[in-house]
């Protein structure tokens, strides 16, 4: 079963998203902090990552930049911020998609 890592500090988002993905035979793991997410990704075994933009420690843009230095895992930015420039920045930093 493909594994997806969600890095989002909203602990209410993970369970319903996990239930949704499970219908498509995808396993979701949530990290609430970027440092936790990077540690999990370093262990390997994930097929894709979903990043929030507004995170503690570092924002999702910096997290994407950091992740791209060591991994080519598909990255989707998922955020409530719908500004066009945010989308441009996310994609320029290496995100594969940006969903406002």
Model-based region annotation:
Residues 1-100:
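N-terminal/domain-start alpha-helical segments
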């Amino acid at each position: 079963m493909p594994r997806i890592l969600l890095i989002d500090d909203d602990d209410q988002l993970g369970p319903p998203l996990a239930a949704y993905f499970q219908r498509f035979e995808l396993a979701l793991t949530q990290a609430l902090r970027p440092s936790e997410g990077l540690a999990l990704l370093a262990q390997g075994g994930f097929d894709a990552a979903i990043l929030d933009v507004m995170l503690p420690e570092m924002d999702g843009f910096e997290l994407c930049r950091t992740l791209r230095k060591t991994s080519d895992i598909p990255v989707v930015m998922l955020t409530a911020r719908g500004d066009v420039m945010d989308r441009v920045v996310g994609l320029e930093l290496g995100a594969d998609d940006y969903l406002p």
